[in-house]
Each structure stands twice: as structure tokens, then as C-alpha cells.
Amino acid sequence: MDFNRRTAMAAGLGAVVAASGATASAATPTTVTVTVQGEAAARTNIPVRRDRRASGGRYLGLWTTEKPPARTGWYATYTVHVPRAGVYALTAVATAPVETPHTEAVASYPHLSVNDGPFTEIARSQPHWYESPPAWGDLSVLDLGVIELRGGTDTLTFRVTEPTVVDDTTAYVLTLDRFTLRPLEGHPALRELSVPRHREGEPALLRLALDGHTTHAYRVRYAVSDHHGRQAATGQATIAAGDTSATVTLPDLPPGHYLVRADGVTGRFARLPARPAVTGPTSRFGVNVWASSLVPPSRLADFAAALRDMGAGWVRDGQSWPAAEPEPGGYDTAQHDRRTRTLRAHGLAVLDVLSPAPEWAMTDASLPLPADLRHAYRYARRLAAAAPEALQLSNEPDVDTTSGTGDAHAAFVKAAALGIKDAAPEPCLVVLPGIAQTGPFQDVMLANDVVRYADVWAFHGYPDPTEPGEPSFPGAADEQHELARRHQADVPLWMTECGAFQKARPGEDLTPGQEIAQARYVVRSTVEGLAAGNDRQFWFAGPPLHDDGVYFGLLDRDFRPLPAYSAFAALTSLLGAAHFTGFVPGLPDGVRGFAFDSGRGERVTVVWADRPVRLDRYVTGTAYDMMGRRLPTGRPVTASRDPLYIATPADPPPPPATTRPRARLSPAEHIVLAQRFSARDAAPGKDDGDAPPPHGYRLGRRTRMTVDVYNFGATARRVTVAAQPVGGGWTVRTEQGREETRIRVPAGGRIGVDFTVRAESSVRRRIDRRLAFGAMLDDHSEVPASVALIHLR
């Protein structure tokens, strides 16, 4: 394509800097910064678009659902002239691959090739992109790292080969206004210190990498320290002239988390325990990943391997329903299915989470659920056909921003669960929504008898971020187990989110003290969760994640392990099968002890205390520190804030209990009742779960509503629907004035039954009452009831 050539004189240099649509400016009296316009590509198959906000009034703009050409991908190649060879910082005004504080717009992860070299994905983490300052519109000023140029004429090619989720579709997106090259004085310099994951007994290989080719022997002195800052090793390495890296072998170190420092650069690595953890579906340990949003495609395989090596048996992931089903019955799950296959190929069991429904499926009154629950049935059945190990039916519906109610969500849960259970003779597990906190929303859901449709009860729990000191395990587990007992729920309980709110520093994330506090809490919260009776425990989160000033991940912003990663690995390695057997009696005041059967003929006790306490007279066995390092025998064992493990031989575990058979749902359970009110009668908003009463639908003195009767069975059914007495001055009648009516519902069909709800003059305003409808088949089998809250507005 044609382009204007521009020339510019650097101040005092006399060097001509020319590029395709480029400008040069003097950053300092001795450096030249080159800016290249996005629309000035020498070769591209991406269109140029106009916008007066762009630096040249135009920009390179890719947005398409069309697959890229197999050989080239969607690409743009630029010819750039720089005054000299060297290392350059690369920045761009473009759309980031993740949401930022100023926009929800996202782009595909771009790949970059320099001088026709191999393409490398710019696979930076969510915290890195999240901090990008705004430019204009949905564009940000992005730090794309450093590159080495040969000087004179160089070429840069940006390429997109992977789609991203954009609202209700999957598309290939690249928006590039301009990019800038700034020479770095004093470079090449040390860029990275890295040690691949390895276990005790395997060699620890330290790789020292420069950001460019050195012209002379480059000598580096390095120091290695453990998680307490104690020096563990020192050494030196030489990178030969003409090379960019060198590798040296570190001395033998115990399991743990280590920092390696040299020339102002810090690296991190984990030396894992020699004994791997139990992995796969039988594991009790899980991690939230949300891979589509938080893990660049090129990193996914190594990320999955890192979780497996850490001892996570489960990952909690999800996909966008609007993107997966952009139109009724038109499914596009290929991208998510590839991620799931990658995770499972590394031995991880997958818990998938259903997202809110597509816009085409919702009405103002049904938000965030489909107005027709048959869409939920079909979508869940489609997801179950991909055979994840488990499907969770929503995430924290009790605290989202909608006016959705517990009864509506219960009907949705029933429909989706039926879709899953009808997908295969041995379907994946049905996991109830992850509830953020006990309260009226969950109470109404449970009153609708949703547990009979599920295999797992789920909830979340986080410590109070306003409490001083280190985080403490929340009371959510005890509350949920008590609630499950009250409802006689004969299903296991999973805590599908558990994490800690750690304030993040821009550009640096956690302080060393916060890192250790996070490592302690990973162990303590998991141990206390298992002791409370949780069957599975999922940490939030695995990948680097910076959300509104809070950091959650087990990996830092460069995908390197934090101390919590190593602590997690020690926990899973030492606890093994992690069958909680009881609290340890007779310990000194202030010491907490939890005993586990590892399933390997060991009893493993986990202890900690808020102040140092000697334990020599109270426990015996082989002791390990929080990172899995074996403590010397014969020395005092002291409980502290860092959890300790004491392993002793034990009798072999009893044979596992017989798994409760998963009964197939009856024809009556394939009938789902759903109350439907108009949008003007919608319940008040949930106010992040803290809204005061009333919580029910807001009715007038006379309100018409509908009970939708769904038949998810394969045979037509005759159903008698009846309103149950409300009391307190309320009456409910059909349009014919009766309390019940008999209808025929075809297989896969939906029939609406209209009712009128009346409030007498004695009814007080803003007082919730239960409105319930029951149903019965002709064989007198009872259909699970629909129970809602109503009040007079």
C-alpha cells in the first residue's frame, strides 16, 4: 500500500530516522524515539479505519468473526528505520487483551515478529495490562516489552491468530493507533532470572537471560534466598559474547520458595516436594482459573502443568454463554473446548460454571436468566455433552446486580440440572450455584427443593477485609454445613471460592509480608475448610489477578510462583488424600492442631499458633515447615504463625465408603414450575446481597401473574397445578376463580397458567409472605413446589 515517507533530524545527531508513517523525536539530547502510525503498514490484510481521535485521524482496526488465513493470520508488517542497533522499549496505543479500569473492551493477544523471526505471543498477565493508562476511546497505552533491532531498516509484524470473547460473540480483534520505539541506554542488560519447576532431587537450572546480544563476556553475580529472606546460595555466571543467555546449576536445596537476585533483577522459583500430590477428580484441592480472561493462549499448557505440579486436582473455569450461543441453537464452544482439553490433558478435573444468559434469551423481567427455561435445559445439555467432570449452575447469584429472585433461580437450576442429567447415562456432576453468603436468596432457593436435583452443594467464603491483622477463616463453612443439615441435604459440600483480599501495589503487587501472609492463609483456610467438612476446597485464584486494587493470584504478574504456590504444593504433597480425622487434643493454649489420614499409612497433623510455642512434649514424628522442608530431627519443634506438619506412621485407612448411587430423576421431577411476574412487579435489587427486607415481588392490591409449567420429560403429562394458602389477607385464584387447574403439557413443552393474587385491606405494606404453588401428576406423584416471596408495595 502507498504511504508517506517522513524524515526528521534528531537534535544534534545528524541521523536521519525514517519509517513508514513514522515520526522521530528527541527523548534526550542523545536518544531518538520513533513513532509509527498503525495505518502505515507496508503490508497488511487488516483494514484501516477513520477516527478523529486517532493520532493521524486513522488507525488499524481488525474486528471480524472470519477465521484468519492459515499461512499468515491477520497481520500488519511495518518497515522501521532506527539510527543504530540495540535494545528498544516498545509501547503502543492499542486495545488491551483484558478489561482495564476505563473500558470493558478487549482485543486478541497479539503476536510479534522482528525481522522475519519467529512469532512470539505478547503473553503478559492481567495485572500488567490492567494498569495500562487510558489513551482514547477503548485504547490504552500498552507496554509491550523490549525488542532488539539491528539498526537501519528493521521490520515488525503484528499478527492475530486467536479469537477473543467480545460481548455476545467470539471475534478476532486488533486495534492499533500507533507504536513507539525508544532506545534503552546501557543495554543489553539482564532481563530475566528463571528456574524451571522441579522437584527435590532434580537439578535446579538457573537461566540468566539478557534483553539482547552482548558484544563481550557478560559476568553476573547472583544470590538465592528462601521465603524468610535467608541466604541459601550464591554464585556467578558468564554470558559469552554474541549470546543472550547462560544456564548454571544451583546447589541442592530443600523444598520451598526462593528468590534469586542479580543486577537489580529478581527471579522466583519453586522447588517442589519429591512426592507428588493426589491429582484428578479424587483430589480435594482445586483452584479458580477463568482461563479465557486470565491466561494467554500460549501460556495455558505450562500454566496447567504448574497447577498439576502444585497438587491441584480440580480447576474451576467457565465460558460466556452469550458468546457460546450467539443465537438460539447456534453453538460456538470450540475455543472453550480447546482450553478444557488442555486442562484435562494435564490431569486436571474441570468444574465449568454457567454464566448469565444471552441478551436474546432474556426479558426485563427475567434478567439475568432466560425467559424460557428450555434454553437453559438445552444449553446445559450441550455443555454436559463435552463431558467436564462437573458443571456449576451459576456464580454468586445472591449478590449480583440484578433483581433476580431465589425462586426464579431455583427454576433455572432445575431446568439446567435436568439438561445435564439427561445428557448421558453417567452425566457429569451437577453443582449448585456458588452462594456468596447465607440469606433470603439462598433460603428461597432451598425452599424450592433444588438439592434433590444436585450432586454437590456449593458456597464461597472470604475473610472480612476490614479486620486488622492476618486474614482468618470465615464462618461461611459452618453456616453452610448447618444449613445443609437443617435441609437434610445428603450431598457433599464444596467451597468453590476461598481467598484473601490483599491490597496490591501498582506495578509491584504484594509486599514480602503480604506474600507470606497469603502463603499462611492458603494452608490455614484449606485445612480449616476440610476440617469443617468441605469435600473440595477451591482457592481463588490461580493465575495472576489484580482486581480493583486487590491481588488474588498464586503466581506473580510474570507467571512466576509466589510463596503461596509453594505452600500449596507442600500442603497437597503432605496431606495426600486429606481425610480429616479430628482436632488434636491436649495442645498448649493458643495452638491449633488438625489431624489427617493421608491415605498412605500416615497420620499428618497440621499445627499453628499466633505466638511461638514449643511442642516437643506434645507431638512426635517427622516435622516439615510450611514449604515442605523436612526439619532436622532432635531439634525443638515450635508452633508459630507458619503452619507445621508432623507425620507419623498410622494404620492403613479403612476401605472407602460406598458411593451413594445417583438416582435418576422421576417424571414428576422433570416437571418444573416457574412463577412469572411482570417487570413492574420485580423484586427490589439485591444491593450486593445486603439489601434490607422486603425481598419479594412487589405487588399491588390485585396482581395478575403466571405459573409456567415445563415438561422436560419425553412423554406428555397431565398436571394439576394448585396455589397453596398464603394467609395474612392474601388470596390466590385462577382466572376461573379456582385454586387449582388441570392441564396437559406436551413433551418438551411449556404451558402458562394464569392466576390473580389479591391483597385485602388488612394486608400491611412491605411485609414479605411466601407464595407457593404445587403440582401433581395423574399418578399422584408430587412435583417439586415453586416458592416465592411477595409483599404489598
Predicted features by range, described:
Residues 28-189, 734-735, 747-754, 775:
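Extracytoplasmic
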Residues 416-442, 487-501, 534-545:
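Aromatic-lined carbohydrate-recognition surfaces of secreted/lumenal glycan-active proteins
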Residues 275-378, 392, 398:
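N-terminal substrate-binding region of glycoside hydrolase catalytic domains
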Residues 93, 586-621, 626, 717:
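Carbohydrate-binding surface patches
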Residues 506-566, 584-586:
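Aromatic/acidic polysaccharide-binding cleft in carbohydrate-active enzymes
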